[in-house]
Every structure is written in C-alpha cells, then in structure tokens.
Amino acid sequence: MYSKELGINFFGNESNKKNQLNKIEILKKNINNFKIFLVIAGTNTSQISGISAAGINAKSRRKTALADAEFLLKGASKDHKYKLPLLNAGVTPALISHVCAKLINIHPVIVPLGLGVKPYFNHLVVEDRDLGPSNCLTTGKSMSKKRVINLYEKGLAIGKSSKQPILISESVPGGTTTAQAVMEAFGLRVANLVGSSLFKAPRELRKKVVQKGLLNANLKTDFDSFDVVAAVGDPFQAFSMGLLIGARLAKQSVILSGGSQMLAIILLVLEFLDLKNEDDFIEDVFIATTGWLVKDNSLSDLLDIINEKYDVKLLGLASPLNFKFSKYKELKDYELGHVKEGVGAGGISLLAFLDGFKNEEIVSLCQQNLEMMKVLGQISLEKDC
C-alpha cells in the first residue's frame, strides 16, 4: 500500500489506513529522540566466494563492517583509517545513513562483535574481541551456545535500560545467508524470498550452503532459538534478539532497519518468547527498509509468511528515497538493483523523510559526500584489497 501524503510504501500487515497513519505519527513524534545502534559483526560465512556484494573479494569483506561504521560516524574524511571496499557496482549504503543521521542530528552507537580488532572510534564493548568471527555456517557449529547466551544477555540488559526508542541496524557481510539458515531451521521455506546485496541473489549457492549447515547441525526436535543461532547464525543475531526484547520490556518503540536479517531477528524472538499475546509485543515494532529492497515483493512475501505463521501484524515501511536523477553512476546503480540496503539506510532515511527533509536534499548531500570520498581516496582500489 502506498501513502501519497507521505510517499511511503507500507507492506506486510494489511491494517487500515488510519492505523498505519497513527503508527507513523508515533515515529514522527520521536524522530530526534531515537537511539541508533549499528551492530557490525563478523561471520566466516562471508568468506565463501560469491556469497556477498559487501566487498569485491573475501579479504575486502573482512574490512567492510569497520569501514561502514567509520563512514557512518565521520562521513567523507581525510583522517579515515579504513578504506571502503570497492564494489562491483554501487557504493556503500553507509553513505545514505551518514547523510540522514546528520540531518536528524542523531549520533549512532557502534557495537562491534566478532571482528577480531578493536575499532579506534567510540564503540560499545560487549564481548572479548579475541573471540573473533563466528564460524562459517556450513560447519553447523557457528558459535558456542555460551557465547550466544552471553551476547543475548548483554543485548537484553542494554535494551531494558533504554529510556528512548531505538533503531537497530547492521553491517554483517554474509548476514543474509545466516538469516536464511535461521529461518529454514524453523521450517520456513524462504530460499526464493531472501534478498541479497548482489544484483542477482546467489540463491543456488546459498541453498547449498544452508543445506550443508543444517545437515551438519543435526538439530533435534526440541531445539530453541539459542540452539539455532549457535548452529547456523551469527553474533549480530544473538545480541539483537536481546536488544529487541529488552527495549520492548522497557516499553520502547523499535525500528528494525533492514531486510531479511531483521525478519530473522523477529522470528528468533517470536520462537523464543512464550507470549500470550504476540501483538502486544509487536505493536510498536517496525520493519523499515529501502524502496529498492521491496521492488520485487519478496520481502513483503517473507513478512507475510512470518505474520501468518505467528499470527502477528508486523508492519513494514519502505523509505521513498530514490536516485533516479542522480548524476553519479554509483548512486544510479541502486535504481538498477545493486546494493539495495545496509547500515540502516532504509530506516534512517525514513526518519529523515518523516522529519520533513526532501529527496532532493538527501540526494544532493549524498552526491557531495561521494565526490569527497573520491577526492580523498576513501574507496579502495581492487589491488589494495
């Protein structure tokens, strides 16, 4: 459904227009009060050739999350430490998120998990950095259950202490594949619905990877969400489960900014909680993404499956941001289906639109930052990766 007044596409729950507009008003009242979390996490699933567009090769994908976080915080800067990996097409969605976060005057909180290095910029310390990335999901042993529970409990505590609404975003190369594995572990047949940062989703490759992981995991009939994340998930999922539950226990609204990775979080939470009325929990939870990710309806279909399976009414919102008239190929590539989403681009740009900023303003600032990135050599050349 499309809201002409707001330029926003609604998907998922077919609630009436009045209810949708009421929900939007909730967000509009709190725009400048949101706390944005960017969870940057490592999984060795990202090292599989052809699995992700978040970097042109396996080596560059190890740096992607750090470079995204740095750019989200600082934008184009001569003092950058991490070069943004060269992509086959497009440019990091951190560009969009940085521009829009500055417009609405929100300073994101970075949560590094499983990266193996300590970022030089301000960040939230949740676990020992020496733990490193989770294993490739094909092993069926991504992480120890102890690590999963620790990450969940840390997220839960942070969420429960929240005094303001939160937005959860991510930069997890390989994360759509772990998301698919988690959903399929719970019986959802989603191989043809889970999206990708790549122009053409590597569905056959992902199907083989997920099947191998689930076979090796050998999950029994009495498994729970922790078991699934430990088997085929990633650190982002464990932490974000807790963060979402904690924030809702604190009666805060939550925007899950992304696509299939955020739906995997919802699924894990709904499987984990013994709720008498799931709708009370979901009431002020929103999935927010970019218009590019919902173009082919796959994400909407995926959301419908979850709404039906768990008898909830989760609402999806798609940002109206577009680069149709941009003068730069890297931005126009988004219109062709490249990159699509990441680093909270959908949710953060949605908040900027709800705060009254126009598409032309956002595009202009994205172009200015892109120009500076090029001048400052902030995008790596392939030979540097």
Swiss-Prot record:
Similarity comment: family membership: Belongs to the UPF0284 family.
InterPro entries registered for this protein in UniProt: Nict_dMeBzImd_PRibTrfase, Nict_dMeBzImd_PRibTrfase_arc, Nict_dMeBzImd_PRibTrfase_sf
SUPFAM superfamilies: Nicotinate mononucleotide:5,6-dimethylbenzimidazole phosphoribosyltransferase (CobT)
GO terms, molecular function: nicotinate-nucleotide-dimethylbenzimidazole phosphoribosyltransferase activity
Biological source species: Prochlorococcus marinus (strain MIT 9215)
Protein name: UPF0284 protein P9215_05181
Coiled-coil regions listed in the entry: none
Pfam family membership, one: DBI_PRT
